[in-house]
Amino acid sequence: MTGLFNNPRRHLRTLIKQARKEKDPDVREKKYNEALEYGHGIEKKLEHDPDIAFIIGTIYYIKGDSEKTLEYMNKTLEIGIFDLDALAIKASVYLNLKNKDKVIECCDKIKELDPKNKSLLEIEDELKKI
């Protein structure tokens, strides 16, 4: 019965929600850092869980750390190669870095999996602007 209440993914998402609600930027940053600390603490135990890698990568994305975001999205895709959200975030990071080739590579993978994907259409529109 204790396993029912011990859900690390849920707790990590709760920490992120708390950070997102915070109005003070310094406190919000601190809460995101706390979420990262917790995420890294459970990462080894759940190393084959693509959700943990994805959530940690998303925190880095929110914080604007492109390198770490890509690292964790790549981990997510190593575990779950068909993760459309991870591919979309990777494409968005590469879009921000103005790396057209990598954006196109991610978009091509998304197209293979889901040609009508909403994120894909948005990313392709943004790609035309760079």
Tell where the protein language model's regions lie, with residue ranges.
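Eukaryotic alpha-helical solenoid repeat scaffolds
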Residues: M1-L12, Y38, K129-I130
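Structural signature of alpha-solenoid helical repeat scaffolds
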Residues: G3-N6, K44, E78, E112
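Alpha-helical adaptor scaffolds
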Residues: K17-D85, I89
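Extended amphipathic alpha-helical coiled-coil/heptad-repeat regions
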Residues: K23-V27, S119-K128
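Register position in tetratricopeptide repeats
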Residues: I62, N96, E126-I130
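Extended alpha-helical scaffolding segments
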Residues: L84, A88-L95, E105
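Boundary/linker segments of alpha-helical solenoid repeat arrays
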Residues: L84-A86, L113-E124
